[in-house]
């Protein structure tokens, strides 16, 4: 089977066959939490809460934003796979940051939530058939989105925000 790779789930000895392109995307998706964890490593609570760049979120706020959107995207992907063209609601990151106690949250809890959500979703994604990645949902703002598009978007979400964390670290000289 050219262009395909067998993937063995370590906790389930059943061999799943996933297209290589999807497996590579799933691997990138799984790598995100480690990248995020490394980007905040060694930061004190004060540094996590600091806003060294005017008008920008603190590092903790960035991590909380990422943690809030992981279950949202997981739900969207599950609904696209399980339901027929489900409605996918948009979120409001600024409203979440304002109302969801970002300054009181614990960075380790947020990182753990991201890691566990992605591990669970990767297990589900690896069980899918190639055609399942073309299933669609209807986003309230963006219109029709495939499961593949949702996976690509959430996979790129952490790397996108790591740039801002690195910018804050430079501004704090850490």
What label would you give each PLM region?
Residues 2-13, 49-93, 122, 134-174:
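Short, contiguous alpha-helical
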Residues 17-21, 56-59, 96-110, 141-149:
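Acidic/His metal-coordination segments adjacent to aromatic residues that form catalytic metal sites
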Residues 28-39, 97-134, 154:
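Acidic/histidine-rich alpha-helical segments that form the ligand environment
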Residues 24, 31, 64, 88-90, ...:
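Short linear motifs at secondary-structure transitions and domain/linker junctions
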Residues 14-45, 68-79, 153-156:
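Alpha-helical bundle segments that constitute or directly flank the non-heme di-iron/ferroxidase center
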């Amino acid at each position: 089977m050219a262009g395909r790779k067998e993937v063995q789930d370590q906790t389930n000895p059943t061999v799943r066959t996933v297209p290589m392109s999807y497996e590579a995307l799933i691997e990138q998706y799984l790598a995100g939490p480690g990248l995020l964890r490394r980007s905040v490593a060694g930061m004190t609570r004060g540094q996590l809460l600091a806003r060294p760049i005017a008008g920008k979120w603190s590092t903790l706020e960035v991590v909380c934003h990422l943690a809030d959107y992981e279950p949202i995207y997981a739900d969207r992907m599950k609904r696209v796979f399980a339901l027929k063209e489900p409605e996918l609601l948009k979120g409001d990151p600024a409203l979440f940051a304002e109302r969801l106690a970002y300054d009181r949250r614990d960075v380790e809890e947020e990182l753990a939530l991201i890691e566990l959500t992605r591990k669970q979703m990767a297990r589900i994604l690896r069980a899918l058939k190639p055609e399942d990645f073309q299933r669609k949902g209807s986003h309230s703002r963006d219109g029709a989105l495939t499961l593949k598009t949702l996976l690509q978007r959430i996979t790129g979400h952490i790397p996108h925000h790591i740039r801002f964390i690195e910018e804050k670290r430079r501004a704090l000289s850490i």
